[in-house]
């Protein structure tokens, strides 16, 4: 069983989605299926088949979210030392091949948003950097090949998960 590290924010987000699916979406789709069933022949009833497909999606998502929750390892990144790259660390790195600087915060997979600089602990970048210290150089496999990155800084700052 693989533990899924995440912040309390990520855990609450998954729990809220699961609650919405179980308490709102699931009952609504049952009603939609009943209404569509009343429209006659099920073999050629597009509404019925669409509702059943939606029901399969909802049930599969409920299973997925339940599994994530059961494997969740809620971590308070503010309570961790950030002298080495770890969950919740914000890191500044320098691509030694092109002198470009990047800043990322390592979060759980359900919280990641690369466009906002939030990368999953399971991403190739995070995997290559976790456990390293300021000044270390890491080779990271990128889609266009391998590049060397120097860790310029490691620190903790409150993670902004702005949902907008």
UniProtKB/Swiss-Prot annotation:
Hydrolase among the record's keywords? no
- What organism does this protein naturally occur in? Helicobacter acinonychis (strain Sheeba)
Keywords, sorted A to Z: DNA-binding, Transcription, Transcription regulation
Among InterPro entries, the record links this protein to: GreA/GreB_C_sf, TF_GreA/GreB_CS, Tscrpt_elong_fac_GreA, Tscrpt_elong_fac_GreA/B, Tscrpt_elong_fac_GreA/B_C, Tscrpt_elong_fac_GreA/B_fam, Tscrpt_elong_fac_GreA/B_N, Tscrpt_elong_fac_GreA/B_N_sf
Name of a matching Pfam family: GreA_GreB_N
> Example GO biological process term?
regulation of DNA-templated transcription elongation
Family to which the UniProt record says this protein belongs: Belongs to the GreA/GreB family.
Described function: Necessary for efficient RNA polymerase transcription elongation past template-encoded arresting sites. The arresting sites in DNA have the property of trapping a certain fraction of elongating RNA polymerases that pass through, resulting in locked ternary complexes. Cleavage of the nascent transcript by cleavage factors such as GreA or GreB allows the resumption of elongation from the new 3'terminus. GreA releases sequences of 2 to 3 nucleotides.
Protein name (record): Transcription elongation factor GreA
Coiled coil ranges:
none
Q: Which gene encodes it?
A: greA
């Amino acid at each position: 069983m693989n533990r899924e590290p995440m912040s309390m924010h990520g855990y609450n987000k998954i729990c809220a989605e699961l609650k919405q699916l179980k308490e709102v979406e699931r009952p609504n789709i049952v009603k939609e299926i009943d209404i569509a069933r009343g429209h006659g022949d099920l073999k050629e009833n597009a509404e019925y088949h669409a509702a059943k497909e939606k029901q399969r999606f909802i049930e599969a998502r409920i299973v997925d979210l339940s599994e994530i929750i059961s494997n969740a390892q809620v971590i308070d990144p503010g309570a961790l030392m950030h002298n080495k790259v770890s969950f919740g660390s914000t890191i500044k790195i320098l691509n030694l091949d092109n002198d470009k600087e990047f800043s990322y915060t390592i979060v759980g997979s359900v919280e990641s948003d690369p466009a906002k600089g939030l990368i999953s602990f399971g991403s190739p970048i995070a995997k290559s950097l976790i456990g390293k210290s300021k000044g270390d150089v890491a080779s990271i496999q990128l889609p266009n090949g391998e590049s060397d990155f120097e860790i310029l800084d490691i620190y903790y700052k409150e993670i902004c998960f702005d949902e907008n």
